[in-house]
């Protein structure tokens, strides 16, 4: 069966997490992703957070499935020739270098267009044009500058970053969509274009409901926030709201049976208006159905702390799974707080390919996330990440069409090996 992106070739100059997230998704959809790495060291994450000495780390392997690796010294004249040939042979170049790095390598947008007018150049940067465009950005910096951290946490505590990688992986997913869109447009125009995704922009896009609330503040308090029911005035910016739901339906994380010893014995509970009477029945507060303080959604907003305290009295008598079973029968929205251990052992996630077991030649078997997007006519088979330079000769021969003599010349030039250190005179 053919894959959705069969025939698309990606020149992957990305490293760490944001860019590799993008190119891995494209590889899962069938693109031929050629990862260009520095000879001798490769992507820095190969050696970061290693759990097994002298093998590629999980940090690297889980972001680089289904790719081929070529090592190339792009400062070497022969290396530049190979890179030029790769640009000529590929459809998309993806990079997440610091600002200006590609230009300093001698491959400006104009130069790339001269080599291959159909080339799409896709870039991840920390910021878009503006006062911070030259600043270095990592995951947590993106969360802090994109509005996520200022609105995450509790009102009386400091800003918090989320455990989800919305800055790195989130921006990588945004860029992948931009690349596919540019490929579609190229089908009609025949021309390549530049695609850029800034991490600050990506985080702000994912935090859009907070920008919504910022504008609502001009017209009065945010009544679904706990702060309103507590009688605490709002300031001029969206506050941190703990675990309050951001969708207009009051929600909280509540303790379940065993919370004293299990840090994840909790459930998220949404007091949705259409099932309010069922909630009252479940927790044994049938009088709330008609009580003026609880009968309508507007009336309940001033009493959310009391309401959820009472619901929590009930959830604490059940395990999170028992509570979920009972609540789901009445269509009451809820979800258990699942640990990474529970997710790793979830048979249904294995069955759908959301979590997969991968066999690697040096580190053995490990678990990874699979493709979260399922296409009925383009199923994803997760293949292990490449060893450093594993496909160098294969790419030189099969992609670029170099003969044995040319390949030997490239090897002899030092373009595929770590640069030699000059001895001090």
From Swiss-Prot:
Keywords: Transferase
Entry-linked Gene3D superfamilies: Crotonobetainyl-coa:carnitine coa-transferase, domain 1, formyl-coa transferase, domain 3
Active site location: 168
E.C. number(s) listed in UniProt: 2.8.3.16
One Pfam family hit: CoA_transf_3
BP terms from Gene Ontology: oxalate catabolic process
Entry superkingdom: Bacteria
Functional pathway: Metabolic intermediate degradation; oxalate degradation; CO(2) and formate from oxalate: step 1/2
Gene Ontology MF terms in the entry: formyl-CoA transferase activity
Described function: Involved in the catabolism of oxalate and in the adapatation to low pH via the induction of the oxalate-dependent acid tolerance response (ATR). Catalyzes the transfer of the CoA moiety from formyl-CoA to oxalate.
Subunit structure: Homodimer.
Sequence similarity: Belongs to the CoA-transferase III family. Frc subfamily.
Official protein name in the record: Formyl-CoA:oxalate CoA-transferase
